[in-house]
Structures are given as C-alpha cells and as structure tokens.
Amino acid sequence: MMLAAPAIISTTAQQQQPEWQSQYAVGLNKLDPHTYVWPYADASEVEKGTFEQSPYYMSLNGQWKFHWVKNPDTRPKDFYKPSYYTGGWADIKVPGNWERQGYGTAIYVNETYEFDDKMFNFKKNPPLVPYKENEVGSYRRTFKVPAGWEGRRVVLCCEGVISFYYVWVNGEFLGYNQGSKTAAEWDITDKLTDGENTIALEVYRWSSGAYLECQDMWRLSGIERDVYLYSTPEQYIADYKVTSLLEKEHYKEGIFELEVAVGGTASGTSSIAYTLKDASDKTVLEGSRKLESHGSGNLIVFDEQRLPDVRRWNAEHPELYTLLLELKDAGGKVTEITGTKVGFRTSEIKNGRFCINGVPVLVKGVNRHEHSQLGRTVSKELMEQDIRLMKQHNINTVRNSHYPAHPYWYQLCDRYGLYVIDEANIESHGMGYGPASLAKDSTWLPAHIDRTRRMYERSKNHPSVVIWSLGNEAGNGINFERTYDWLKSVEKNRPVQYERAEENYNTDIYCRMYRSVDVIRNYVARKDIYRPFILCEYLHAMGNSCGGMKEYWEVFENEPMAQGGCIWDWVDQSFREVDKDGKWYWTYGGDYGPKDVPSFGNFCCNGLVNAVREPHPHLLEVKKIYQNIKLSLIHI
C-alpha cells in the first residue's frame, strides 16, 4: 500500500504531463522485485553458476536496430508495431550507452544536474526535465522463442536502462520503468507467437528519475546492462530468502533459515525441497515441504537448522556452500531447479564497533563506479580484473557508489572475498540539503522506497553484502527516515548506513565523508557515542594524492571505534580516444563539446587505477598501508 497510495495524489497539471515527467511513475506492470531465480537445467549447473548456458535462458544482447532523435516530438511514434519498417535504421550494440556509439553528447558533471543549464534553456524544476532538448532512442530487434519453451511462462528482464523507457512486445504495450540500476521484469507469456517476435524499447535521456541520479559520473543514456528472457514452468519459484548467520556466543555454529515463495498454479499438490552442500559436494542440510495450496501465493518457511563447526565466510576466507532448490510436482518429478551460493557470516554493530563474525573489522575500502570504454557497461572480464587488482592491493571492502552494481559483481565478491556496502540508486545532490532537498518532499517517497526495495530484494542473499546504504549526498528527511524504517523491518541483521543522516537515528554507522584526522579523534574521544566512525569517502585519489593516508591509519589502528573508510575512488572515469594522427589521449568533461557544454573538467579522474586499469603510483601506497601484517626491526 505504501507504494501504490501516493500515485493517486498527483495534481491535474501533473496528470497532463507524460509519465517520464512524474515522480510517481516509477513503473507500470512490473513484476515484484525478488532475488535472482536463475533457471538451471540440472543440479550440477547450480554449483558452476552458469545460468546463461541453461536452455531456459536467452540473451537479447547484441545488435539492435536504433533510431535517435533530439526531442520527443520527432520520434517515430509507431515504431513498436511489427509492421513498421526499420530497414533504414542503424545498428547499435546492446548493452552500451548511445553517446559512446556516436549519438548525442557525453556530459560529465559532479554535483549539478547537467540539464540545469543555459545550453538546454532550462532551470531545475522537479519533477520536470527539458522537453524540446530531451533525446529519445528507439530500439528494436526480433527473436524466436527457443524450442522447449512451449507451455511455459516467459519473463523479459531489462537489467539497466537510463533514464526512462516504455516497452512493447509484438506491438502490445507491456509497461514502463524509471530507475536505471536495478532490473525491471514483465511476464510476456501471452504476448508471444510461434514465429518471429518483435521487442521495442523507447528510451528517454532524461526523466523525473534523473533528479535521483545526480551522481559524480558521466551522464549517459540508453540500454547499459543486459536484456534477456528466461522461462519457468507454470508453477514456479518466485523468490526466496536465505538467512545464514552464526550464533552470537562463540560464532562457531551456523544458523540456517529459508523462506521460499512459489507463484503460479499446479494441477496437484507440489512440494519444494532444498539441499545445502559444502565445497566437497557433501550434503550438510536438507529439507522438504508440501505446498499448502494448488494456487499462487504459497510461502514456505522452513524450520531453522543448526550446523556445528560451520565453515565461516569472511573476506580472508570466503567459504561458500551451494544451495539447491527443487520444485516438484505431485508425482515427485522435478519441474524447476535453481539455487545460489551461501556464506555463513554475521555482520553487526557490537559494543559500538562494526564486526564480522564477532570480530571488529578495519574497513580497507574503496568506492567503485562502473566505467569502461563503452560508458557504464562493464564486461565480466573487466569486473574480474577489478576485483583481482583490489585483492592484490589489500582492499577488503567496496562501496557500490552510488548504485547497485551489475549482478555478476556480487557473485565475484562472494567468491573472492570482498565486503560490499550496497547503495541505493538515490542521489539528488543538485537540489542541495536544505528545504528544497527531495529527501524532505514526501511526494518523492514512492521513488525512494522503490529504489531501496529493489536494491535489497535482488541482493539480500549475498554473504558479501555486509552493509546497506540508503543513498548518497541527497540531504536527509522524511523519505530517508521511511526507507531506513522499511529496511530495518525486513533486515534484522546487517547494519544500514546513510552519510547525510550524520548522528540522526536513521543510520547505524557514523559515516561522514572527508572528515579530518582531528575530527575523527574528537568523535571517538566522546563518552556518548554508540556508533563506529567509518568514512564512506576519504582521501580523494586525484592526481598525486593519498599523502595523508598514514595519519588516518594511525588513528584507525589505535582507536577501537574508528574503523577505516573507503577511498574515493577506484577508477578514472575518462575515455581513451585516438586523434587524426593516430595518437591516443584521455578525454575529460567538456571534451565532446559543444563549447559551452556543462562540465567539471578532469574532476572525473580520481582513481587508484586509470580507465584501462593500469595502477597509479599511489595504489602502491594504499597497498602498503592496507597490509594486514606489519613488521618492525627490533634490537636483540
């Protein structure tokens, strides 16, 4: 009800605006957010995690037909109809931002709205964005439903599209979505044909959602994450929640809890079974329950189980188990298989200190934007390169700044051992922190809740996620109080942080950014504090930097409630281009023109590594100070 009720409060004037100009229009006809229920063909594939190889998964990445216009009035309004001729259209790579493929202008700004500028003849006025200057990209491609999907449910998933889009299949309208960093899904089963099918997306560069995506990054547009289909039986596993903790006396015994939601219908009495296996493929826990009804809406809550001397997950020893879930029909035949990796670990604030498995942890962290030559589309290979470099340089924590990352990133963090601060895709920096802040405007609550909920539901089962973050640099007010309340109602274990909450109730960690060493010392000297000080950002690794790191870590290693922080940031957000003479060079804000384009210049380059992941010299300083073993010469 919290999500639906505010949508009917809009004024007549707002109702006359298109959906992409309304703060209430967070989505239409989308499936409820849930953990990833990857389809697998058999149990052996769950261990490998190779869901893309499943016969019930179909990628729609690749070449799409594309048409780009400078304003909505000139867009091809009927392009979504299969009969519409696209023979003269260009091809575009999906995923990939259109500015990196020859359309529009890549703009880099920091804390301002790029459209709040004379270049676009517009002053910020939420929820409105420029109309005449708002670019629209029309995407189309065809596909055939794979053999073996007959009689099964089919879901379309768009992992990330910025900033707002409408979607059709075979000319039939599915809905729309706003919010570029979490998946949106639609059930398209009854829209499909036996032969060729047509999918169409109409994408707007700016929307009301842009007011919540004012992050320090290149402002780009288009389909920037994967698009795919997956298929389930008519009765299917809709969601599941794994709680895998340690008992809090000795932190040696594992506590396993499992909830499974089943959707759809079946003709007989179905059952759900789970198996938990260790790294040697030995079954350590299992259970089975019959569903209470043949219809949809079944929620199965398994009894809590204990696992003595469990192999604990942490960043140094990322011990993982494999959970296998099987849905079975009345005859005991397996109709669906899915699963995930499970790590037993406890993340908590204990006696004023941030602890993993009961042990205080020093956060040796870094902030990470998603950045590549394609824009904000990052390949699996580049993600693996990032995490290997981080581990090689003693980094143990990554803050997903400032939005949920690609789903593969969490799998890597689970496997390699990296603590994750998962952050909701909310930053309204350009509105400031005062009375105009969107944090204080309750008409924006549905959007804040939607983004927070989608972050939590998709990533709730990852052991690497040890802290949730409500967002970044968006002021504080009723909307962040409500998102904190919601998260704490569903998350009983992991801490929640928000930098702009400062010492208000809606943060479990005092996580101010760029505070001096003296400020930290003064905080931990107080007698009234009960939250650890962990800087969500510090050092700002631009140019020849990180020179004050030693002084910070003298405090962190000697003051129990000062527990480190996350360096800003991991990678330079620049692009490598080639001039007319064949020489390469780095580009920064403003380099793509025109002359008066909004720009923060080379402020996009604050990384410990450059844009092609070559380490800067100060990364070695970080490696030295972040090392876990310190030696000193003594006289004997």
Feature locations, PLM:
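Short glycine/proline/serine/threonine-rich loop/turn segments at secondary-structure transition edges
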Residues: 149-152, 192-196, 306-320
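Low-complexity, Pro/Ser/Thr- and charge-rich linker/hinge segments at domain boundaries
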Residues: 224-241, 344-359
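Extended substrate-binding grooves/exosites of carbohydrate-active enzymes
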Residues: 16-52, 122, 172, 211, ...
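Surface beta-strand/loop "capping" patches
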Residues: 234-266, 617-633
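Beta-strand-rich binding/interaction modules
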Residues: 167-169, 253-291, 300, 633
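Accessory beta-strand-rich segments of carbohydrate-active enzymes
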Residues: 19-22, 50-51, 67-69, 97, ...
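Bacterial Sec-dependent N-terminal signal peptides
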Residues: 1-16
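Accessory carbohydrate-binding/adhesion or oligomerization-edge regions at the termini
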Residues: 14-118, 198-202, 206, 279, ...
